[in-house]
Each structure stands twice: as C-alpha cells, then as structure tokens.
Amino acid sequence: MFSPRTEIENLRREINRHNQLYYVQDNPEISDSEYDALLRRLKELEEAHPELVTADSPTQRVGAEPLKAFGIVNHPYPLLSLANAFSDTELEAWYLRVKKLLGNAAFQIDCEPKMDGLAVALTYRNGKFTTGATRGDGFQGENITRNLRTIHSIPLNTEEDAPPVFEIRGEVYLPKEGFAKLNRERADKGLSLFANPRNAAAGSLRQLDPSVTAERPLDIFIYALGYAEDSLLPDSHWQILEYFSRLGFKINPRNRLVNTLEEAKEYYREMAENRDSLPYEADGVVFKVDSVSLQQKLGDAGREPRWAIAYKFPAEQVTTLLRKIGISVGRTGTLNPYAILEPVNVGGVVVKQASLHNEDDILRKDIREGDTVVIQRAGEVIPEVVAPVLAKRSPESKPFSMEETLFNPKLSRPACPVCGGEIYRPAGEAMHYCANVSCPAQFERQLEHFVSRGTMDIRGIGESLSVILAQEGLVKNVSDLYYLTAADLLKLPRMGEKSADNIIKAIADSKSRPLDRVIFGLGIRHVGNETAALLSSRYGDIWALAGAGLDELQTIPDIGAKIASSIKAYFSEEKNIAVIRRLETAGVKLASDQKPSYKPLPLSGVEFVVTGKLDSLSREEAQQKIRSLGGTAKDNVTKATRYLVVGADAGSKLAKARSMGVKELSEQEFINMLEQS
C-alpha cells in the first residue's frame, strides 16, 4: 500500500505522460474513461490531503478563482514582429539581402506555417511553468499564466535535463473543428458567435475566469526559444525545436528545413494550395535563417529581425452583391463613398461594408449599385472592393455619379446626406466636400479626432461616446470638453461614477499635451501631425501661428500655397478663435517649451533621415529635435535628403544614401550639430 504522497506523485506522473501522448503526440494509450478515472482518483486524494496540492498538479489546470485584472509582464527579450513579403519577388529580395549581409555564405532555411493565433511567451524555472504572457507591444504583455495552465499541450513541468531557466515562445490557436463546435454551442445558448478562430482564441485567453478558458479547446505550437540560462544548446533553430519536442513541447509537424530558395518557394506553394485543408487557420509561411549565430550576426532592423520574413498568402477573394453606395461625412467635410454589401464571410470576418475611396476611383473600376463585386481584405484586414463581375451586371445599371447619388429632391440640388448643406469639389482634388461648417456629422468626426490617441489622447472617450456627447449637446465644440463635470457625464446612459471620474481625470491630464498635438487636434484641413510639428517648432505659440501671414507660412519647408491658405482660413474664422480662447481659459497648454522664434530656425530647409539604433536617444526623439530646430525629418532617403544620421545596425537606407551621395552623420556628429544649432 502506497502512502498518499507516493500515490499522488505516481498519479501525477502517469497523468502527465498520458497528457503528452494525447495532446502533443496524438497517440493515446488509454480510453477517455480510463484517463478520467486516473484524474478523479488524484482529485480525491488531493481533497483529502490539501497540504499535498502543488501548482503543477494536473488538477490545477482548471477551477482557479477569477481575476479582477491581468498583471503586466516585462519581456526580457522583445517579441519582435516580422517583415512581410507578398510575392516571390519580395521573398527573393529578402533572400539576396540576407546572402549579401552574410558575405554569400550558405545558410539553411526553416519553413513554418504562419499560424493565425496569439503569440505567447512561457517561462520555466527549475522545470516548472511559472509565467505565461501575451506578446502585447513586444516589450510588455499581460500575465495570463492561469489561463495558459488550462491548455493541456503546455507542460506544467519539464524533464530534468531542461535548462534551469528558459523562455519559450508559441502560438495559441483554436483548431477549426473546435471553433465550429464552440460556435454551435454558443448558438444553442443564444450567445453571439465568434467571427473567426483567432478572435475566439484571443477572447478565450483573456478571460478573467480561467474555468471559462478551460472549456475552450485551445492548443499551441512552439515556434522559438526566447532565451535559456546556463545551457549549451545547438546552433540550429531546427535542432533547438527538436530538443524542446523531446522535453514535451508541441512542435508543428508541418515545419520543414530546406537548403535553397527554390525549396522554400516550393514549400510556400504547397502550404498555399493546401491552406483550406489545414486543421487550423494559417495566413502565410514564416522563413527563418536556421543558424542561431547567423541570426545574431544579421541582427534586427528596427522592430523586425533581418533573419526572418513572413510570406503572406494572397488575400482571400469572394463575390457578393453591392446593394447600395452610401456616403459618409468626414471631419473636414469630405464626402466619402462606401459600399453597402450583402454580408459575406471573407477570411473569417463577416464584411458588410467596404471603402470606395472617391468618385474617380469608383469610375476607374466601373463599380455600380446592384453589381456583383469581388471583395478582398487587403492585408487580411481592410475590406476592399476589387472589381465588378461584368458577366453578372444588369443591362439597366448606371455608372456612379456623386452628384446624382446626393441629389435631394426637396432642395432640387445635390446636398450633404446629413445636414443638407451644399456640396462642392475643389479644382484638382478627388474629394467632394460638404460646405456647411456646422454640419453635425463633421463635428462628431472632429471630436473623435481631437480625443484620439495621436492627438489629445483622452482615454475613455472613443467613437461611440464622442457621438453621444455631440448628439446630447454636452459638447458643441472641442473646448466644451474641458468644462464637463462628472455630474454631466452621469446623465448619460450606462455611465457609472468610476467611469465618469476617470474620464474627467483624463480630460484634465490632456491639458499638458505638446503644442503640436493641439494644432493637429484642431483639425485644420491639410495639416497632419508632421505639419503640426513644423508649425509648433516655427512659432512656439498658438497666437503667433494665428497671426502668421500667407507669405510667411510658405517660407516654412514643406508648406505650400494650399496648406498655407488652409491655415490662414482656419484662423480667420472668429468661431475658431473663440474655441481657442476657451481652451486657453480652461488651462490647455497653447505654447511649447521652446522659446518662440520668428526668424528662420538653424535647420530650416534641411532634410534629415535617421536610420539604425541610436544610443543616447530614440529615433522619435531625434526626429523631434530636428523639427524643433526647423529641420525636416523624413522616413525615406530622397534627392532632397541633406543628411543621413547613422546608428547601429543601419539598414538599406545607408546603401541608398551612399549611392546618392548623401552626407552621413554619426550619432556624435549629429548631437554636436544639434548643440551648435
């Protein structure tokens, strides 16, 4: 007769072995009922002896108390994103670039299906799974350890010869069969259906109650080692994955190691042809240089490794009926045509609408109401109308006309679909506009823009709340935001005290945003974030900018007659000046920390490009310093580029700059130039 401790330890070993056989090797030795009997006996013993329960017991995969929120995990080594290729030509360019950087040295290529799931990092210490985190922004992720413990193909402990501390990375996914079953169960319960397996996997992993996650048939494939301490591992990605497979981790059996570019292309073609028959969603193939030492030699370019690339599958195309061409109103009065479609599933997402850009684009493609059209999700994300199916076109169809579509019989003229204002199309522009500056739809979009992350970044006020605030009359111009109270917000439906307090705090916090954000947030036509930064550094004060003349504005690099006229027109409107005065009264910062300068700044007219990693400041900080001194910071080298600031691991921009004779500056030379300016 075994002691309870010994029987518990034996049961755990046996159950873990059967988990490995069933979930990882797909080779079960016992029936489900026999497995359930083992697990039931272990639960009975642990309930009788709670002091013997451990975190890595198979019984602990389910049943933990719900969390109130996820904690944050810092990734010791960033989870980088991958550069994309969309054609054989782009794949060949990557291959030749790698070959050149390696001095034409031969290298093998790992080929792996690009799973459409959620990337996670799993940390093990002394053989035990201790922490699991989402990818997040690559540097920080959410702590979802308890939810990951419910996935049977993730070992809770490893073999004795595993490294003492290591992080391994994988893709959590929901198999197609499991996804279909999950949606059938939700339909039976009257619940909303998941749009695609990726959304279902994401929603499952982010449940605060791990028992909900445990009910979902999630799985995982390990695709990379993050790091390992005190361990001599092979200099081969392929062999490292084989090693971790022996430790009990699940590796995709469709991975392949090849020696040539042609073999890599053949692998891609095979995967693309068999995409629909795969038991999981995949949106491409990942190619990696196999040698770890060569990976380290190649390094990273920004947030992408040079030694890997994702070759995406072609966008999935389907046909559906274009019921109607609708028109929406943008924040600057643009009238934006869009397709209203018979709902259709494209790549796992139900698409009901798609952008049509402008009248010229519609006429170029000859898209008409009532057409059967080809739809694709560009980059697997944005729905796009590719073309009409002419063979199915009705002989009664008519070419699209913006003015006919917007014709208002009551007004006997084309009119804005929201306010009835007159419409116009400026010479040389593709867009039509609503002439009514008081159009409510324009203001709703303006408010959304003002509070968005890239401008005043007011957390808690998104698209839907912006519309409600405008329609309820609580906010009639952007300055009204700064006079709202929690009591005002509590009058709105489904608004709680805590949410109201958080929004008021976020509004107060936004008062100290930099001047360029305020300028961008005002929504001046043709003034994007880069132009706003130029204006901020040139004038340093909103009132100085408001008083600038047309000729003076056009002396600023990259500001021509059209932008200058738009700026002048904005500040000539008394209602806009009144809004700015109210912002000032509310305490919004309307001057930059830099002393205003009405003389040409030291770097006026000088264009810079920054490449590589700088030690003393980030690329964004370097660009900001350039702009603050009147210079222009661009992302690409052109004939207009005066200087290329070169940091560590400089990429293709360096070669291009040298071929064009652009002057190079080291980081120290760049800093010296800034200090002297």
Curated annotation (Swiss-Prot):
- Keywords noted in UniProt: DNA damage, DNA repair, DNA replication, Ligase, Magnesium, Manganese, Metal-binding, NAD, Zinc
Residues binding NAD(+):
32-36, 81-82, 112, 135, 171, 288, 312
Q: Which GO terms describe its cellular component?
A: cytosol
Record-listed Zn(2+) binding positions: 416, 419, 434, 439
Note the coiled coil stretches, chain numbering: none
Q: Which cofactor does it need?
A: Mg(2+); Mn(2+)
Where the record annotates domain BRCT, the positions are 598-677
SUPFAM superfamilies referenced in this protein's UniProt entry, alphabetically: BRCT domain, DNA ligase/mRNA capping enzyme, catalytic domain, Nucleic acid-binding proteins, RuvA domain 2-like
Q: Which Gene3D superfamilies match?
A: 5' to 3' exonuclease, C-terminal subdomain, 6.20.10.30, BRCT domain, DNA ligase/mRNA capping enzyme, Helix hairpin bin, Nucleic acid-binding proteins
Uppermost EC category:
ligase
Q: Which InterPro entries match?
A: BRCT_dom, BRCT_dom_sf, DisA/LigA_HHH, DNA_ligase, DNA_ligase_AS, DNA_ligase_CS, DNAligase_adenylation, DNAligase_N
| PROSITE patterns (UniProt xref) | BRCT, DNA_LIGASE_N1, DNA_LIGASE_N2
Q: What does the record list as GO biological process?
A: DNA repair; DNA replication
Q: Where is the active site?
A: 114
EC number in record = 6.5.1.2
User: Which GO terms fall under molecular function for this chain's record?
Assistant: DNA binding; DNA ligase (NAD+) activity; metal ion binding
Tell me what reaction this enzyme catalyses.
Answer: NAD(+) + (deoxyribonucleotide)n-3'-hydroxyl + 5'-phospho-(deoxyribonucleotide)m = (deoxyribonucleotide)n+m + AMP + beta-nicotinamide D-nucleotide
- Its job: DNA ligase that catalyzes the formation of phosphodiester linkages between 5'-phosphoryl and 3'-hydroxyl groups in double-stranded DNA using NAD as a coenzyme and as the energy source for the reaction. It is essential for DNA replication and repair of damaged DNA.
Which PANTHER family does its entry note?
CHROMOSOME TRANSMISSION FIDELITY FACTOR 18 (PTHR23389), DNA LIGASE (PTHR23389:SF9)
Q: Which family does it belong to?
A: Belongs to the NAD-dependent DNA ligase family. LigA subfamily.
Q: What's the protein here called?
A: DNA ligase
Q: Which organism is it from?
A: Dehalococcoides mccartyi (strain ATCC BAA-2266 / KCTC 15142 / 195)
